[in-house]
Amino acid sequence: IGNMHSASAPPPDESTFFLHMIQAQLARSAQLVELPDHVGTLLSEPKNEIIVNFPVLMDDGSHRVFKGYRIQHNNVLGPFKGGLRFHPDTRLDECKALAMIMTFKCALMDIPFGGGKGGVKCDPHAFSEAELVRLTRRFTHALGANIGPEYDIPAPDVGTNAKMMVWIMDTFMNIGGGDRSAQQQRVVTGKTLECGGSVGRDKATGQGVVHC
């Protein structure tokens, strides 16, 4: 495959090295399987890059503005699918790289989903539970119709958990006019068992590392 990157793109620095590494791996793999040029070009960049800035009321009465991301890489095989991470080092380029990897993982295992990834640049350990509730709900509200059970389905990742997925689900259903049907509950995976989650989800990633 020829040059997938813009001629004006700056050389990778430490913060973008991961993304450039994944793009380079895609280019090498595309050559090996003789992937058509236009397919490689499409896969080298995400379909959508969503960046939101949203205010959150803190316990001391002040407001802080947080930056959140949702990268939707490719949905040819099915809805975008991938985790949400709350971490101080969450960056756009990191989310882009991880979303690409999700696309490839789903395709390799013949799972009918595409690749997505996102998160909020924050330290979740620095907040009270009440602040985390407000942050998660405000982020969900800011994403709005950019997620949904037939379009983009988030899941837990670094710094997030099953309880937060329930907060996302509840907020999403409220945004949708109060529709609390089973279909709307599928907006996220990794929920608590009491709210429709799956048995074994909390240790699935670790088991995958051990057995695969």
Task: Name each model feature, range by range.
Residues 4-204, 210-212:
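N-terminal ligand-binding/catalytic initiation module
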